[in-house]
């Protein structure tokens, strides 16, 4: 494959996708640097609606709460430190932001507020993933934003670009769309170089490509092209392509709705399956293991099944829900490591539900994190 970026040409095809994250910047929702406006949000909502009608799933990561708060209380009236003022404005504006999105959709819109700490902690990460997947299953439209009211370090350049990449990996999205007020990535700053070319395809984020990124070009937003490329690198490491496009251009949205590329597509560094398996294979192990019987081992190895409690013999160590553990098979011929994966239950809980049916979990524990001890998406066979 050609590793050089290519200039835009008509009718570049965008590979089909089933699940996407759409990141919407403040420059599209508060174009004048003031309060929220539906001017560009409407076109984005129509793109989302068309995608949902086609049987696809979309999670929106939306900036704009601080910008909305400024219109409610002038910044000069906000007391305290600059950080405290921004956090207060975020609290005031978040209700306005979710209300803006709700007005465009007949289906329920769900507000999900996250911090980077939520996604660094493995157990909270799993809970966030389960919540988003359940919202999608229910047919709701999740609208994610950073929880600026309680964040400290996170209120900085480009947070929602990077948050969108993390959310894309969290829900196993096929593509990350980043909508802003620029057409995509140019080989030079188009504001100072009239002959700058818009790049349609970026096969690899090389240092030369990163050097093409300029600074922020909008009043309302906090992230420039550099942070968008950083987000694309994060998504690419998880096997997810990124598309940068101009959310102010109705034509761009129409093209994307018909799977035609408008803007810049940044290719993933590796396939999603390869990225996931690599992470599962090399993530640090917690002390402990889940011991399974021969039937469970055969189901894992031969059928690609999830690990159910009925096939579990016991658990070793003191691991917690969300920890990476080994899966062992013990028999007359000794012990064999057959897999590693993320346990949905603690070691104590695994011991209590071992040899039991999945439907009995809640009766035994008083709660239920799902019918699998390790879901097949969170498990890698060691002979793979």
Task: Please annotate each region the language model reported.
Residues 2-384:
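C-terminal catalytic "cap/lid" subdomain
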């Amino acid at each position: 494959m050609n590793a050089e970026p290519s200039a835009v040409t008509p009718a570049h095809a965008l590979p089909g996708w089933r699940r996407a994250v759409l990141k919407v910047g403040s420059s599209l929702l508060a174009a004048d640097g003031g309060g929220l406006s539906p001017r560009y949000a409407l076109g984005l909502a129509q793109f989302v609606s068309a995608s949902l009608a086609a049987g696809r799933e979309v999670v929106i990561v939306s900036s704009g709460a601080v910008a909305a708060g400024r219109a409610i209380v002038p910044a000069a009236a906000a007391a305290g430190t600059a950080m405290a003022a921004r956090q207060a404005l975020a609290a005031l504006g978040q209700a306005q932001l979710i209300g803006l999105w709700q007005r465009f959709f007949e289906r329920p819109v769900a507000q999900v507020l996250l911090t980077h700490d939520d996604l660094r902690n493995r157990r909270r990460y799993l809970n966030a993933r389960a919540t988003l997947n359940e919202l999608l299953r229910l047919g709701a439209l999740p609208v994610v934003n950073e929880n600026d009211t309680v964040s400290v370090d996170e209120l900085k350049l480009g947070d929602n670009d990077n948050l969108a990449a993390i959310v894309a990996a969290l829900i196993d999205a096929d593509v990350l769309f980043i909508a802003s007020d620029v057409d995509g990535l140019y080989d030079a700053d188009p504001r100072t170089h009239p002959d700058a070319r818009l790049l349609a395809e970026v096969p690899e984020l090389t240092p030369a490509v990163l050097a093409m990124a300029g600074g922020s070009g909008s009043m309302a937003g906090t992230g420039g092209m550099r942070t968008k490329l950083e987000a694309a690198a994060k998504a690419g490491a998880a096997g997810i392509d990124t598309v940068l496009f101009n959310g102010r251009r109705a034509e761009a949205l129409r093209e994307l709705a018909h799977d035609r590329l408008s803007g810049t597509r940044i290719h993933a560094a590796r396939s999603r399956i390869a990225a996931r398996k690599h992470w599962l294979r090399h993530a640090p192990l917690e002390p402990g293991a889940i011991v399974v019987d021969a039937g469970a081992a055969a189901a894992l190895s031969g059928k690609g099944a999830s690990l159910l409690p009925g096939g579990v013999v016991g658990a070793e160590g003191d691991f917690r829900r969300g920890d990476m553990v080994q899966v062992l098979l013990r028999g007359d011929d000794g012990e064999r490591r057959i897999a590693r994966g993320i346990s949905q239950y603690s070691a104590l809980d695994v011991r209590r539900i071992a040899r039991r049916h999945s439907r009995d979990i809640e009766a035994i524990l008083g709660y239920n994190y799902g019918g699998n001890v390790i879901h097949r998406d969170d498990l890698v066979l060691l002979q793979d």
